[in-house]
């Protein structure tokens, strides 16, 4: 199970886009799509049924979730996530470095 969720602010820790930050657009299994990261060129075929035009399109591609880490805005560094239960018994995501609750999008 991925600890990162759609809307989280992450930083790339490995690969060609190392050091760049972005917002998570999608999480599928062990892959993640981040806004403005891992841009690839796709040669799109025209489709009359959907009205999509053909041509060369640049879009974000999925990258492995191990290549990104959540960005802690308080420490301005990459961080990890752990889970803790609050007083009511609700499960919360917290930063490992300082124990603050991760803001949900």
From Swiss-Prot:
Disulfide bonds: none
Pfam families for this protein: KOW (PF00467), ribosomal_L24 (PF17136)
Presence of keyword Flavoprotein: no
GO biological process: translation
Highest taxon above the source species: Bacteria
Recorded GO CC terms: ribonucleoprotein complex; ribosome
UniProt GO MF annotations: rRNA binding; structural constituent of ribosome
UniProt keyword terms in alphabetical order: Ribonucleoprotein, Ribosomal protein, RNA-binding, rRNA-binding
NCBIfam families to which the protein is assigned, alphabetical: rplX_bact (TIGR01079)
Subunit structure: Part of the 50S ribosomal subunit.
Family: Belongs to the universal ribosomal protein uL24 family.
Known function: One of two assembly initiator proteins, it binds directly to the 5'-end of the 23S rRNA, where it nucleates assembly of the 50S subunit.
UniProt-listed PANTHER family: MITOCHONDRIAL RIBOSOMAL PROTEIN L24
Protein name, as recorded: Large ribosomal subunit protein uL24
